[in-house]
Design a protein with these regions (language model features):
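Active-site-proximal, Lys/Arg-enriched surface segment
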Residues: 1-24
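Single, function-defining residue in the core of a domain
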Residues: 23-252
Length: 252
């Protein structure tokens, strides 16, 4: 399932956590899991929780934990909240919530009424089986000109700025950028091997290749695309610029 596309798509079954620093615009994968339920019996939700627990063991303390609504299970939300961290995630429109003045009376997220003030500040709601969250409604214009209404929630109840909320949510798109670069630059989807171990090794090597390109790009102040293309470009310039380049002799 792709939260970006809003439908099931064909892709690599990899779940990963990405660290992003908005001050330097650096983004790096800190952990990943290959989804293979038949092999280990774990769902993508299980992998997400395992990686979050491992990140805490490694003393990661991010300002925000961002993820798609597909992973917004009560179990993961509670893990993040108990770790005293702030999450911000998209919420499905059929999730049940209760208003401040109507506690115990639940309704779907998309059935809530919104005043002009609440459009800017969000509104406090009680998420069933979890607790208080601040909910924002954001209308996005899609490339085809249509509009899509999205709902996002956070446990940072003091956040009352839609502009700030959209800025924070924008950080989440770095995961899409990472996957796009991984696919376009490393051939992670083009493994020809049939053995499971070989396929896993291919994915691991592809991620390592991206890391090498990223390190070179940051060191030279260029993009990862240029970091891959430049060595070949420099070589071709050198060879084509040499008048004494080797030529096959004509047969006598």
């Amino acid at each position: 399932w792709s939260g970006n596309a809003g439908k099931v798509i064909t892709g690599v079954g990899v779940v990963n956590w990405l660290h992003y620093d908005p001050l330097t615009d650096d983004y790096l994968p800190i952990d990943y899991r290959i989804w293979d339920r038949e092999r280990d019996g774990k769902s993508k939700h299980d992998h997400a929780r395992d990686m979050f627990a491992k990140a805490l063991e490694r003393d990661f303390c991010p300002d925000w934990v961002l993820f798609d609504g597909w992973y917004a299970t009560v179990a993961l939300l509670k893990m993040i909240h108990r770790a005293e961290l702030w999450f911000f995630t998209r919420v499905k429109k059929n999730r049940m919530v209760s208003l401040v003045d109507q506690q115990g009376v639940y309704q779907r997220v998309d059935a809530l009424g919104w005043s002009d003030e609440e459009e800017d500040t969000g509104q406090m709601v009680w998420l069933r089986a979890f607790g208080w969250v601040r909910l924002f409604r954001i209308v996005r214009r899609l490339p085809d000109g249509t509009k899509r209404t999205e709902f996002h929630m956070t446990n940072q109840l003091q956040l009352q700025s839609r502009t700030t909320a959209e800025t924070v949510l924008g950080y989440r798109w770095k995961i899409e950028q990472f996957y796009r670069e991984l696919k376009q630059l490393t051939g992670v989807e083009r493994c020809q091997a049939r053995k499971q171990r070989s396929q896993r090794n291919h994915i691991h090597c592809a991620i390592n290749a991206w890391l090498l390109l990223w390190e070179r790009a940051r060191r030279l102040g260029i993009t990862v695309y240029e970091a891959k293309r430049r060595p070949f470009t420099d070589y071709l310039r050198e060879r084509f610029g040499m008048p004494t380049a080797y030529r096959r002799p004509h047969p006598v």
